[in-house]
Amino acid sequence: MAAAQPRLPAGAAMVRRLARGCWSAFWDYETPKVIVVRNRRLGFVHRMVQLLILLYFVWYVFIVQKSYQDSETGPESSIITKVKGITMSEHKVWDVEEYVKPPEGGSVVSIITRIEVTPSQTLGTCPESMRVHSSTCHLDDDCVAGQLDMQGNGIRTGRCVPYYHGDSKTCEVSAWCPVEDGTSENHFLGKMAPNFTILIKNSIHYPKFKFSKGNIASQKSDYLKHCTFDQDSDPYCPIFRLGFIVEQAGENFTELAHKGGVIGVIINWNCDLDLSESECNPKYSFRRLDPKYDPASSGYNFRFAKYYKINGTTTTRTLIKAYGIRIDVIVHGQAGKFSLIPTIINLATALTSIGVGSFLCDWILLTFMNKNKLYSHKKFDKVRTPRHPSSRWPVTLALVLGQIPPPPSHYSQDQPPSLPSGEGPALGEGAELPLAVQPPRSCSSSALTEQVVDTLDQHMGQRPPVPEPSQQDSTSTDPKGLAQL
């Protein structure tokens, strides 16, 4: 005898059974089974969910979001700015060349509204500013010669000298003297600044749709000389008063001019290219970009200097710390045009999403309904095709679904064999042959239904009234596996 194979441990056997079951289930085919449940509450929930999904796709997806269009964001853009106006301080008139930085104009332009001037600076030695950390001193030993403070104005000489005013002392530095804050002068330029005008020329291009447009109307050449922007009357005259921009951003002009700030001019080009070109118009909005209530980062200022020589030898400069209103022009937008591909994709998504209602109602049906076990039994069937069906018995869907027992392929002990000819009682008119010896019937729907019903009744031990073939509806038994509740 062959040696017995060693038995696998219980864990290994369980893993093998699990793997075998997973492998077998992997090749199963699942198909939906239609069940009609006559329950108005469940039907109401189903239709309401479908209606909400349909409204969402029709109103929001297709009307609001215009998902039937192919879109392009981030248009190619060019910006040119030009500022005009004059102002004056206590003793000086300021024109555009002095208070606008940079002078060439672009997407960013700064308009100076207040300055701190340190005039006549020359290279030499002088007291360090008291604003510099650890610049105050009492003795020369408090100042280290050659020390360089990156937040300061120069290199320390090692001497402790009196400050520009008062009794305090600071370390002496080698720098442009006098240093800032020592002898600075303040000048306010914002008195007439609200009346400054800013021309913003903008043109955009959507390369996907080969569409271009600008924010200036094609009118007479002198049109821009006599107009200012108005959303209703002159939307294509992009000349803005500085006071109007600050007001639209919700800021106080005097406060903003004193401390400085950053204002964004946002131009939005949202264009529906299915409409005419005249419907594609720029929309302007204004808001402050720097944090207003953060003392460490609010405001806007920068420094620059003007250099000149005295007697052709000594180089001097005037240092200017400028506070101003910086204008940032920001352009964005989106263009859309009808396209067949996104339309088909979104329609398919909408039709698929309607099935969510059926999934939700199936979950309610199998979880919360009173007859959930009955519904679960009717909804799920496990089907196995017979390996060796009898050649004399037609394989029907009712047989495969298990609604009738399979026919015996051989006579068993429980079934009597067919009587040989000449033996047994004679079969008169109207007598019925045993099941095993009945001649095969034609595969019509009525005959198949009678066969399924008779076999089911024999299997269940009941005998319903025999229906008349010409009068009865053959759909009382469902050979297609469809259950109706």
Swiss-Prot record:
Q: Which segments cross the bilayer?
A: 44-64, 340-360
Which residues hold ATP? 82, 84, 197, 297, 301, 303, 321
Key word Ion transport present? yes
Q: Recite the UniProt keywords alphabetically.
A: ATP-binding, Cell membrane, Disulfide bond, Glycoprotein, Hearing, Ion channel, Ion transport, Ligand-gated ion channel, Membrane, Nucleotide-binding, Transmembrane, Transmembrane helix, Transport
Q: Show the ranges annotated as biased composition (Polar residues).
A: 469-478
The way its activity is modulated is described as: Fast activation by external ATP. Exhibits slow desensitization during prolonged ATP activation. Not sensitive to the ATP agonist:alpha/beta-methylene-ATP.
Name-wise, this protein is P2X purinoceptor 2
Naturally occurring in which organism (per UniProt)? Mus musculus (Mouse)
